[in-house]
Amino acid sequence: MQMNKAVEMTDPAKSLEDMVLDHHRSQLALCDRLERLADSLPDKYDPQECLSISWQLYPAVKSAHKFEEEELFPKLLEPGQSRGDIEKSIERLKFEHWEDESSAEDISMFLRQMISHPSTTDIGKMSYMLRGFFDGIRRHIAFETEYLLPKLREIQ
């Protein structure tokens, strides 16, 4: 069983960019685990891995989003910074955060249900939810990497 801990919110020894990248790595590792789980459905999944993911998913996603909304986004929106379309992009990302957190809660609940009551769980729905979630997280991270991190480098 692989463990993923939520990344520490702030670390004074690290740059803001390094902390963003730490959160990205943590979330991408969870996405890889979710993809392996989706590939193992319907009958080759590891119940312990499901349980582990179910307890780690929401806290990891919430921690990354809290960090972005309290540390990264305010830095990018500081007065005097060249903003361009960044305000619209950040608003969209905040909305995606809400959607991702809601999906993470749903997935966690379904994973626990799948372990405790496998005969009542719609495995096809579970696989679809997992794939939609990890694809969305990966796209979100790719956008932040390609658009927000270069903006952050310009102002640091």
What residue spans do the PLM features occupy?
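Small-residue-biased structural context
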Residues: M1-Q156
